[in-house]
Amino acid sequence: MKLNFLSKILMLINLVLLTLQLFLMDTFWDFYHYPFLNLMVPVIALINVIFFVFWIIKFKWPFLLFIFSVLIGFKEWGKLYKFPNNAIPISSGIKVMSFNVRLFNSFEWIDSKSVPQSIESFVNKESPDLVCLQEYSKEFSPKFKNYPHQYIASSKKNGQNGLCILSKYPLLNRGRLDFEDSNNSALYADFFYKKDSIRIYNVHLESLRINLKDTLFTQEHSQKFIERIQSVVEKQELQIDRFDKVEKKNNYPTIICTDLNNNAFSRVYKRLKDNRLDAFMLSGNGLGATYKLAYFPFRIDFIFTDQKFKVINFKTHDIKLSDHKPISALLEWK
């Protein structure tokens, strides 16, 4: 059908947003000059989906623009959404979980006194072989008695905002990566599986520190907001540099559990993932959102694995025991 003047304007806006999304998703080449825009890819994608539905309802040809963009950037769209995998997962393999537990609700963000016990019950029920916890608190943590091997470390003397690796396998060589001028850090530990040595990392990168008081409705506030995002991302890049120095000395295949505090369209994601597998992209379901940023769902928690693993199953657990959702992956050693 022929487009009127208003429809032509809307089509132009839609075309610009679709093109911008493809560039920001790294469809053609690296495009990380504006970290704030990379962070906003899910929002831009939602607007484009709304446009698509609008054109379908109006029965106008610009709905094809969205279809073409999906075909062009099919792989990158997979970072946003995965259709259900109906394959029946095998029961054997290494099951890994990553969960930012937000200090076990020590400041009572959730109106419940039993959050630590509920987290322990959830972990015991899922029974992963290895668990990586971020924002760990020694004071409020349950004992996790089902996990005889535990590695706990914090950059703070009071044990707050620490990291923890829980394991059913003995943890051998262990270490902590302190990040300069930050309360965040990373841990690693090696373990044996089927006579092979494997390394697991628990990585917690610098927080974006976005809250509901942030606004983009004035030039002054929006400029400060964007500058803060830029500053935090630069700090995250330095933390990846620190990680790379340690990882270069490692000869074992790796599993990385991380609260990245950034999304799958950032250079931070690309650098930490490197040539590893993103477990969600291989066996995830739906949006896979793990965190709500100003009420908008984002996927900022990840499990990356060496290519010597086969990702059998991946799950984002829909429970409300923290401001993050836990994720888990079942991995088969090839």
Specify the residue positions occupied by each region the protein language model found.
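N-terminal, active-site-proximal structural segment of metallo-dependent hydrolase catalytic domains
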Residues: 1-144, 334
